[in-house]
Amino acid sequence: EEVYPPDEDTFLLLEAAIREARPEDHVLEVGCGSGLVSQELAGRVKSITALDINPHATRAARERGVEVVRSDLFRGIRGRFDLIVFNPPYLPTEPEERGDQWINYALDGGASGRETIGRFLLDLADHLRPGGRALLLISSLTGPEEVERMARDAELVAELVASKGCFFERLMVLRITRSDQAL
């Protein structure tokens, strides 16, 4: 299968997103995979747009009735959002472990597990509306303290809002806001 199927991380992010979402929110889901999170948020928010680099994922999300754009992170998106949710590729992956299938875009976080997360954090503030926030799923394997440092370096503030132990890792959802706004 070429699309990341909903799993423990998907459901943890979905639960946090449902708690965080407001009826007036314009929402962006980055890396939507199957489109489940966007589909579940659709009736709870003003608008939702999903994106994914994987053409198989965009097709799967579209089949769920989700408005989806094929894009590498924010490249295909203009505008600002009240809420941005992202379940990034966060698994540390050595070069010799990398595959060339589309599913690898959902899994391969680079050597540290933070390559895609770093790119996301660098551009995040430009896509948040005033008072906007993001929910970012990470793993204990990703180095949570390092992710929080990366957020600070991008003038963002990260706060843990959900976590769950799973097999060999702890999954966490960080709520991220611009450092120039109160939490």
Task: Name each model-derived stretch.
Residues P88-T116:
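Mobile active-site "lid"/loop adjacent to the S-adenosyl-L-methionine
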Residues E8, L12-G99:
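Conserved SAM/SAH cofactor-binding pocket of Class I
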Residues D180-L183:
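Flexible, glycine-/basic-rich loop-and-beta segments that form/coincide
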Residues A50, G109, L136:
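Conserved SAM-binding loop
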Residues R44, D100-N104, R152-A154:
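Glycine-rich, phosphate-binding/catalytic loops in enzymes
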Residues R114-V173:
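Conserved Class I SAM-dependent methyltransferase catalytic core
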Residues L107, V173-R178:
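Short beta-strand element of the conserved SAM-dependent methyltransferase core
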Residues E1-P6:
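Class I SAM-dependent methyltransferase Rossmann-like catalytic core
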